[in-house]
Amino acid sequence: MQAASLAFHPPALHTSPSYFSSKLPHHLNYSLFSHTPPTSTLSLTQTLSRKSICQPRAVGKYVREDYLVKKLSAKEIQELIKGERNVPLIIDFYATWCGPCILMAQELEMLAVEYENNALIVKVDTDDEYEFARDMQVRGLPTLYFISPDSSKDAIRTEGLIPIQMMRDIINNDL
């Protein structure tokens, strides 16, 4: 009697371009099974110009003396909130190690120039003022509070990086 020989042969992998990859632009048409890197249609000058756009513009420390948006303590912020104001107050809760906070700082500086006499923009370092940030229910960074000079209006709270146009809309329409 002869023993039956059982051999397992895995199915062959299909390496020809699939329907979906043939619909991709030719510089994105890349098979997972090929050993050649994808080709790019970008020229060297386009690649270099994209890199220069993405380079960080800020040099030096995060908070500088010449910034319009000033870093305040918890006590100073509480005095501003309770005090008499005729302009909206925007409070930025940030951390120096937070990438989105650094991007938001640049946008807030632009807003401070734009709304120089029409809004007061300040910032609080959550590492320095941990208890105050906790009391203000700051859970994610950056967190902004928009506080109207009219005490009958509720404060508006945002969390995360938001576009500068959204900040303008909140200042112009909701405060």
From Swiss-Prot:
Organism whose genome encodes this protein: Solanum tuberosum
What does this protein's UniProt record list under function?
Probable thiol-disulfide oxidoreductase that may play a role in proper chloroplast development.
Q: State the SUPFAM superfamilies in the record.
A: Thioredoxin-like (SSF52833)
User: Which GO CC terms are listed, alphabetically?
Assistant: chloroplast
Q: Where is this site: Deprotonates C-terminal active site Cys?
A: 92
Q: Per its record, how is this protein called by name?
A: Thioredoxin-like protein CITRX, chloroplastic
Indicate the segments forming the Thioredoxin domain, all copies.
Answer: 74-175
Site feature (Contributes to redox potential value) residues: 99-100
Cite the entry's keywords alphabetically.
Chloroplast, Disulfide bond, Electron transport, Oxidoreductase, Plastid, Redox-active center, Transit peptide, Transport
Entry keyword annotation includes Oxidoreductase: yes
Read off the transit peptide span from the entry: 1-73
- Which BP terms does GO give this entry? cell redox homeostasis; plastid organization
Pfam families recorded? Thioredoxin
Cysteine pairings via disulfide bonds:
98-101
Location in the cell: Plastid, Chloroplast
The text of the family note is: Belongs to the thioredoxin family. Plant CITRX-type subfamily.
Instruction: Name the EC number(s).
Output: 1.8.-.-
- Phylogenetic lineage: Eukaryota, Viridiplantae, Streptophyta, Embryophyta, Tracheophyta
Residue positions of the active site:
98, 101
State one molecular function term (GO): protein-disulfide reductase activity
